[in-house]
Amino acid sequence: MNLAVIFPQSGGLPLGKRPPQRRAYHMMELKRWKAHLSVDLNYEPKHFPTNDMPAALIAIAAQQAGHNIADLSLAIMRKCWVEEMDVAEDATLIEAANQCGLDGTALSAASKQDDAKQAYDANTQEASDKQVFGAPTYI
């Protein structure tokens, strides 16, 4: 879903535009989750925020190809939050898909097709219709 559409509908703001106390709380939550889950996590990744649409589109393309996207989603998140890579770049997304045993090049090409973008737009509309206000959200 397109968070740039969803956030303003509920009065939400991107992290960089939030007041200092909300940014501080965000940082505290990251630290709590890192400790709770015992995972690697950069609190301020080099490439965040970034354009998340390419990552969403490659996940949609994988799903449309019949793949379970749980591992791919995790690999993409690791690229950003652990490995300091930009998930707006094709090379990063292709590498993430390949690491999951998928054909990253084929999925990258599929992610640029109209049906992937239409699904992205439909996901955004569904999120809006169901009053989603942020991410992650599970419907």
Predicted regions and their residues:
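Structural alpha/beta surface segment adjacent to cysteine/selenocysteine redox centers
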Residues: M1-C80
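C-terminal cap of thioredoxin/glutaredoxin-like
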Residues: M1, Q64-H67, D71, A75-I139
